[in-house]
């Protein structure tokens, strides 16, 4: 049901951006969605309608609704809050007001539970070690990861403010995924609808190679083999290499070094 609602919201967003709704196929037939959403029923599939709906509302100028929908997504999973800076601007007050009100209304019934409302978040940040993100693979310290993620989200909120909202959302979501302490495949579900509006071959391929994380169970003790990690990261590594080549061609670098 939520996948269908998300599809409807995505079509609305594409039409609002004057993009062919046929692009929604990138979302509807993405293997990651079919396996982790339709097949496994992960809660993250419920986040998609809220996130896409928030972007659609923002593009349509319904800023309070955008803030409220983003709050709904944040109540389900915390990571949609990373998109909040993208919704700010001339309509900052309606967005922040609706976002804050949504969080208060959502958490008020369980406020007596104290920190228990955070669920498994502390364990996720400190104890679990499954398919670690880019930074944690090098430096395993939660404080650094949280700081890097905060800086990235705020910086992206200030960059390219004239670009369409999905184009700005793509690097934010990508950064959140790569800087996450643990990258479970279903955590990338909210990336897929954005790829329908802003197609990116490396990121689309990455939603497929994320399945390599399940090789975690092939070894004893459980761990993702190095070759599986390499395959998983290959699309993004290739995309980064191509971007660098386009930005600084080899012949230009040779001329500078001469």
Regions found by a protein language model. Name each.
Residues 19-20, 60-65, 90-95, 160-165, ...:
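Membrane-helix interface "capping/anchor" motifs
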Residues 1-52, 91-175, 180-184, 248-258:
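Primarily membrane-embedded glycan-assembly and transfer machineries that use lipid-linked glycans
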Residues 44, 82, 185-211:
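Hydrophobic/aromatic-rich transmembrane helices and adjacent perimembrane loops
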């Amino acid at each position: 049901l939520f996948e269908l609602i998300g599809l409807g919201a995505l079509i609305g967003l594409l039409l609002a951006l004057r993009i062919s709704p046929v692009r929604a196929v990138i979302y509807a037939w993405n293997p990651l969605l079919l396996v982790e959403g339709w097949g496994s029923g992960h809660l993250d599939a419920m986040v998609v309608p809220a996130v896409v709906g928030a972007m659609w509302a923002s593009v349509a100028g319904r800023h309070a609704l955008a803030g409220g929908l983003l709050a709904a997504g944040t109540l389900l999973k915390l990571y949609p809050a990373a998109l909040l800076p993208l919704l700010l601007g001339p309509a900052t007050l309606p967005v922040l007001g609706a976002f804050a009100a949504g969080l208060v209304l959502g958490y008020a019934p369980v406020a007596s539970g104290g920190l228990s409302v955070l669920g498994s978040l502390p364990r996720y940040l400190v104890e679990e070690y499954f398919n670690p993100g880019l930074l944690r693979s090098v430096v395993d310290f939660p404080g650094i990861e949280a700081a890097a993620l905060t800086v990235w989200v705020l910086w992206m909120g200030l960059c390219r403010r004239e670009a369409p909202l999905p184009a700005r959302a793509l690097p934010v979501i990508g950064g959140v995924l790569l800087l996450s302490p643990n990258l479970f495949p279903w955590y990338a579900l909210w990336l897929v609808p954005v790829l329908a509006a802003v197609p990116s071959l490396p990121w689309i391929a990455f939603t497929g190679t994320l399945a390599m994380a399940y090789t975690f169970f092939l070894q004893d003790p459980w761990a993702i083999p190095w070759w599986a990690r390499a395959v998983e990261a290959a699309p993004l590594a290739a995309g980064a290499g191509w971007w660098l080549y386009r930005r600084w061609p080899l012949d230009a670098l040779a001329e500078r070094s001469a």
